[in-house]
């Protein structure tokens, strides 16, 4: 959002007149605060880190193109959530994620116990090269959505119910049987919807190694999707942004408002933390 845009919006919406110089001072303060936030020290250990992206239209070399703001949300040892940072990129790649993870490490992160991503290109291999102890889980809800792209509308409800049997199974062995059942029922009609389950099976079923309470935290995406939805709410008036800095500034302000409500640990935290300590006793610093 340019200075003139802010000036016009303040006048039209809030009926407030601010000079160009006053707005420039305010925006410079926001830029400085955003930079300090992005570079702040982080905790040495995060129990879970979710990674996802939200797409915006941004002007780049005279053209308006899609760019993604990638967000990392960490689960701290006190049960609170924290947005670790944001990074703007045109596309995902191993080198891009190497930069993100190097940034987190430089800011103090020594270990991530579990990562949960939308099968982001290059991320799984990169996290394994930097932190081979981390468990990497592909987000199940994103997997369901991706599979449904290949399914016609009238079959989606039934197909989704059959997929639900996979991730609601009591263990990986039963889940594999449910995947076989899904394939037998639908492979003639929707082979590509099932192929992605087969190709990503090991990374889709990491959560079966953990107790039910931790599983639910891993495979649900309500957290990251709610975050993205709230960011959209704050940015819905902008059809496009003039620069990467403008996007980052707007998303930063949105995140600051959202995080004000992140004041309570996630549900059943005492039980869940005890489970983490039993499983990862040598990697958790109390």
Predicted regions: what they are:
Residues 12, 69, 138:
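Metal-dependent catalytic core segments for phosphate chemistry
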Residues 114-121, 126-164:
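Conserved beta-strand -> loop -> alpha-helix junction used to position metal-binding or nucleic-acid-contacting
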């Amino acid at each position: 959002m340019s200075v003139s845009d802010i000036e016009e919006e303040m006048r039209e919406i809030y009926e407030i007149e601010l000079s160009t110089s006053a707005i420039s001072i305010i925006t410079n303060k926001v830029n400085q605060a955003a930079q300090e936030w992005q570079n702040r020290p982080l905790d040495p250990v995060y129990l879970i880190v979710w990674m996802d992206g939200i797409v915006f239209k941004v002007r780049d070399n005279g053209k308006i193109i899609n760019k993604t703001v990638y967000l990392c949300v960490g689960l701290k040892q006190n049960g609170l959530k924290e947005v670790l940072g944001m990074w703007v990129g045109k596309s995902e790649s191993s080198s891009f994620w190497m930069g993100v993870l190097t940034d987190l490490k430089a800011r103090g992160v020594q270990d991530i116990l579990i990562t949960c991503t939308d099968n982001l290109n290059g991320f799984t291999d990169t996290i394994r090269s930097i932190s081979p102890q981390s468990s990497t889980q592909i987000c199940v809800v994103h997997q369901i959505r991706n599979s449904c792209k290949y399914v016609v509308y009238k079959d989606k409800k039934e197909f989704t119910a059959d997929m639900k049997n996979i991730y609601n199974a009591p263990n990986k062995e039963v889940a594999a049987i449910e995947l076989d059942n899904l394939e037998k029922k639908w492979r003639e009609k929707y082979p590509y919807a099932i192929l992605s389950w087969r190709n990503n099976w090991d990374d889709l079923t990491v959560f079966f190694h953990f107790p039910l309470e931790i599983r639910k935290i891993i495979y649900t995406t309500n957290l990251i999707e709610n975050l993205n939805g709230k960011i959209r709410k704050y940015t819905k008036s902008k059809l496009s942004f003039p620069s990467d800095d403008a996007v980052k500034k707007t998303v930063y302000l949105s995140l600051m408002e959202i995080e004000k409500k992140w004041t309570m640990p996630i549900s059943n935290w005492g039980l869940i933390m005890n489970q983490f300590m039993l499983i990862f006793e040598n990697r958790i610093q109390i």
